[in-house]
Amino acid sequence: MNAMKTEQVRQVRRAALAAGVGAVLVVGVLVFVPDKDEGSPPAAGPEARALAAADAGAPASPADLTALVHDKETRVREHPADDQAWAVLGSAYVESGKRRADPAFYPKAEQALRRSLKVRTAARGNTEALVGLGALANARNDFATAKKWGEQVGARQPKQWDAYPVLIDAYDGLGDYPAAGKALDKLTKLRSGTQVLARSAGVFRTRGWREDAAAKATEAVERATSPTEKAAALHELGELAWERGEPKEALAHYDAALQAAKDHHPSLAGRARALAALGRTDEAYGAYQSAIARLPLPEYSLELGELYDAAGLDGDARSQYAALRSQVARAQRNGVDEELVLGRYESDHGDPQAAVDRLTAEWGRGHHSVEMADALGWALFRAGDATRALPYATKATDKGPLSALFAYHRGEIERTLGMTGPARRHIDQALRTNPHFSPLLAPRAREAREALGQPAAGGPADMSGDSGDTSAGTADTGTGGAPGNAAPPGAAA
């Protein structure tokens, strides 16, 4: 390469770092495609690495993400009319909030993204800010709004690849799994690499295609280009092993993830779950406490509370449930919808009717995921309405992944309704899938299975689920969105 060309490349690199999101593609090329004549380029700074990761669809390291936030905060103070810098800053705030489980970042993200659109509207091509708003809505569990923003980008710029991860998450949250699959198809036509593999693994796992999901996650580990990418893919393998009822294998994947990136805090929680299943309870307490200290998510507090509950440590359990309520309240103040985890808590440890009211309202807002169906069905059961509960439990088990928790919930509902054969089949399924699925509920599942006994002569018909009273499976769950009038599970799934 001659001197003039070398200097031109250096000038482009400097311009790219100054320009922000509009130069993300350039940064990606400069960082990941070294010039063969000149040798490898100088090591990129943290801001450039974070931008390059964003271009690749990859997670930036926490340190690089923090550096990017500081860089863009400085940029917009000095250049308040830079719509692209505002869009990058807003998206970086969203990612920071997710990585730290700190919802206080989300109002700041919304302000930055809307400022970007004020400077340059979507009609004038500012689709980057719309993608950021979609990611923000997903982070707040506002999936209908995320769908709106993602579809706007898809309509304006159908080849803008980063709209499709937003749409996949939104459709999953709404329970529109065919649409999520179509969004993944579009993404794979536009992009390749580790993050597309990771997205594929997630979609396949949601559909219950575990072998396909594991194959994609394994390939993502092999092709990872950063420790953070590798840790995320290893964590996915850990989750798949956990769901299969293999805590020892899951623990190995979580440990490998933490070895790759010690700040991959979700793997700390996964590690705690696996340790508890292996009987290493004291270690599990410590791992959960470390995870919650670094990533204070209410679902982790619920898991630790239930682990304490199972051990008879009522005071410690109450402390965790209080922490959960505090975490949910803080999230809600910052626009995050945490009704699902709060409903799960209320069903088993608080007021089941309050859980019914909360989750029925969520269903009325179009949140028809299998997780929501399972939670609403269980809340109805715990509130004494097994007949209305069964259609929701059926949706969760029939349309979702092979989940031990979902199968147990359905089995208990069927047992209450006198549907002995189906109850036996689903509780058996729960214990075969993952005998350690919950420190609190797995022992109850074993007790229920023992109480059900063995099938009588002619057992195959009994075990098929066709015998017994099946009329409850067609119960009318109503037509509206108000509490007590949720739409039937099959109506808009």
Predicted regions and their residues:
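Solenoid-like repeat scaffolds
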Residues: 77, 118-121, 152-157, 185-191, ...
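N-terminal leader/linker segments that initiate helical-solenoid repeat arrays
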Residues: 1-121, 125, 435, 439-486, ...
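Generic helix N-cap/helix-start motif at coil->alpha-helix transitions
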Residues: 124-130, 156-164, 191-199, 226-234, ...
